[in-house]
C-alpha cells in the first residue's frame, strides 16, 4: 500500500522509517 503511505508522507515522510508507527499515528492516523 505505497499510495496510502504517500499521503501521510506529507507530514513525516522518511521519519516513519525511523520512528515507525508512532510518527504515522501522530500525524496522518489521528
UniProtKB/Swiss-Prot annotation:
UniProt source species: Pelophylax ridibundus (Marsh frog)
Keyword Oxidoreductase part of the UniProt annotation: no
GO CC field: extracellular region
Family recorded in the similarity comment: Belongs to the natriuretic peptide family.
Modification after translation (UniProt): Cleaved upon secretion to produce the functional hormone.
Entry superkingdom: Eukaryota
Any one GO BP annotation for this protein: cGMP biosynthetic process
Propeptide: 1-3
Record's function text: Hormone playing a key role in cardiovascular homeostasis through regulation of natriuresis, diuresis, and vasodilation. Has a cGMP-stimulating activity.
Record-given protein name: Natriuretic peptides A
Amino acid at each position: 500500500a505505497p499510495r496510502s503511505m504517500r499521503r501521510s508522507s506529507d507530514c513525516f515522510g522518511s521519519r516513519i522509517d525511523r520512528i515507525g508507527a508512532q510518527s504515522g499515528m501522530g500525524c496522518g492516523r489521528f
